[in-house]
């Protein structure tokens, strides 16, 4: 069983989709999640469309970039290899987000008790994601926000109160 998550440089999950069977391809999850059409409706404050950096399995689109592949473009130039190396450090931060969430909220990491379609796994992950975001706001950040040097909003800002 797996989930797809989007984490911003302030360390907060801004999108979570799943679960799907662990045997499903990542492209299936991306298509089913509706994430790309959502991104197409958003414009950044600079007027440019938002773009995510994702796993190579996702491929390229107007809103998604991935590492250069020697299989696709031939031998990588030094610039391409450098881009891949630097961006791989950014992509791993999503894994840090899931690691933090499952570390803080053990109930989402009890795989033997989680039965796909028989237990409320999706609800548990959504609750854990919300709690993790709250925890990061109340704690002044997390490993991801420290890595990027971007503070999360305050708890009050997050709740818009």
Regions found by a protein language model. Name each.
Residues 1-161:
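Short, well-ordered secondary-structure "scaffold" segments embedded in the functional core
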């Amino acid at each position: 069983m797996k989930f797809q998550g989007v984490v911003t440089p302030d360390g907060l999950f801004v999108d979570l989709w799943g679960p799907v069977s662990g045997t499903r391809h990542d492209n299936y999850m991306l298509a089913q999640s509706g994430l790309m059409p959502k991104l197409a409706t958003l414009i950044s404050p600079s007027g440019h469309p938002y773009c995510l950096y994702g796993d190579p399995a996702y491929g390229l689109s107007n809103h998604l970039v991935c590492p250069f592949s020697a299989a696709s473009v031939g031998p990588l130039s030094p610039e391409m290899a450098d881009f891949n190396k630097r961006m791989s450090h950014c992509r791993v931060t999503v894994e840090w987000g899931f690691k933090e969430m499952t570390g803080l909220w053990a109930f989402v990491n009890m795989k033997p008790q989680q039965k796909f379609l028989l237990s409320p796994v999706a609800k548990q992950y959504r609750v854990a994601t919300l709690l993790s975001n709250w925890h990061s706001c109340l704690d002044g950040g997390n490993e991801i926000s420290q890595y990027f040097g971007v503070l999360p909003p305050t708890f009050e800002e997050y709740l818009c109160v």
